[in-house]
Design a protein with these regions (language model features):
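An acidic, gly/pro-interrupted, aromatic-rich
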Residues: 1-122, 159, 167-201
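Extracytoplasmic/periplasmic ligand-capture domains
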Residues: 152-156
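Amphipathic alpha-helical substructures
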Residues: 109-142
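Long, internal low-complexity/basic segments
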Residues: 138-142, 163-166, 176
């Protein structure tokens, strides 16, 4: 799911091979499980933040929380099939984890710059990127209405827009209006959290 979000946002680095990477993780990770607290988690920067999940550095006593929440195997033995679960924690990851928020911001930027001039065109473009099909008219209308509502909210609360757009290390296009970009980021997050995008049966 993380790789999919990074791919549609244009952030995914597809380079193969190399050492393990350390993407965004909660502060204080490893402090409780390292011997004497002498091993600290040091987050990577640059393109290492956007490598495929299979390259994520794995500490057996403190695996990446976002991967654990989605039932990633412990790597102690081979797993032929992963268990299927659905918990509120998973939604919290896809809605709030910096990697997903940053991916939504970059997907929003793609929708604005590549998706056309109207909100309807941008919604259709974003939907096709994440779901590989056009949205039904009723769904597109709901997403456009959500955009308009969020745009009004962010115009009134510019600090919230700035805070949302500051998530993540990737550079954003500063020529895009902050309120507009933040509103599209919310819509992009909604798209990345669609059931058909995050569930494979």
């Amino acid at each position: 799911m993380r790789d999919n979000a990074l791919a549609v946002s244009g952030l995914l680095v597809g380079r193969a091979g190399g050492p393990g990477v350390k993407p965004y993780q909660p502060p204080g990770l490893w402090n409780e499980v390292s011997l004497g607290g002498n091993v600290r988690f040091r987050q990577d920067t640059g393109e290492n933040l956007y490598r495929k999940s299979m390259y994520t550095y794995w500490k057996r006593s403190a695996p990446a929380p976002s991967m654990t929440i989605f039932d990633a195997p412990t790597r102690e033995k081979c797993m032929v099939e992963r268990p299927r679960t659905n918990t509120p924690l998973q939604a919290l990851v896809t809605l709030n984890d910096p990697q997903f928020t940053e991916a939504a911001r970059n997907l929003a930027q793609r929708m604005i710059k590549e998706g056309g001039q109207t909100a309807q065109d941008r919604v259709t473009y974003g939907y096709r990127l994440v779901a590989a099909r056009k949205p039904k008219p009723i769904v597109a209308n709901i997403l456009v209405a959500a955009y308009n509502e969020e745009l009004e909210n962010f115009k009134k609360n510019t600090e919230a827009a700035d805070k949302l757009l500051d998530v993540g290390e990737s550079k954003r296009d500063e020529t895009i209006n902050n309120a507009e970009h933040a509103a599209w980021t919310i819509v992009a997050s909604m798209l990345l959290n669609l059931d058909e995008v995050i569930t494979r049966l």
